[in-house]
Amino acid sequence: MILERLHNNEIINNMSLESKFVRDQLVQPIFIHEDEKNETTIPGLGKNKILFESNIIETISDDVKNGCRNFIIFFVPKTKSNNQFITSFQENILLKIKKEFGSEIEIWVDLCLCSFTTSGHCCLFEGEKINYADSLEIMSDIALSYVRGGADGIAPSSMLNGIVH
């Protein structure tokens, strides 16, 4: 199988170069909190800040002006739950970003349940045991939501077995 996307997409092609280092191999992390209204510096991550809906386009625009075209988004939902995972905020943010920038940038999205769950774990539990089936199903639903929003890639960071085959 020929991976057409590598050949037809300059940004992805540059990310996979082996013999030289180019700016397109760098990925800017973006942290977006659903309920945050003020920029907050993230301890231990230099000048990275937790962003919010009203400043995300301006922030990405500034990064693009500085030559950054690859971004990975880490969403922090307002409400934590172990049984209800609403991704409309995330999907709408992605749609907004893609509408503004189109194929000028690549957007990857972190996939894990840890920011969604009340426990902060990468999975759902049934009693004291990991519920693999429900965890994988929920993560699949979240990934599909990101794709509907226009994410160019999904970056599974979950420590749960079975996420990546």
Regions found by a protein language model. Name each.
Residues 39-51, 66-93, 153-164:
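Glycine-rich, proline-tolerant flexible connector loops at the mouths of alpha/beta enzymes
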Residues 38-55, 114-138:
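Active-site mouth loops of central-metabolism enzymes
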Residues 1-39, 43, 47, 58:
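N-terminal amphipathic alpha-helix/helix-capping segment at the start of soluble metabolic enzymes
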Residues 31-35, 76-78, 111-121, 157-159:
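Active-site beta-loop-alpha junctions enriched in small/polar residues
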Residues 24-30, 71-73, 105-111, 154-156:
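Hydrophobic faces of well-ordered beta-strands that scaffold small-molecule active sites
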Residues 30, 55-56, 110, 146:
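Conserved, mostly hydrophobic/aromatic
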Residues 80-99, 105, 111-126, 141:
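N-terminal active-site wall of soluble small-molecule enzyme domains
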Residues 61-64, 94-102, 164-165:
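Surface-exposed amphipathic alpha-helices with a cationic face
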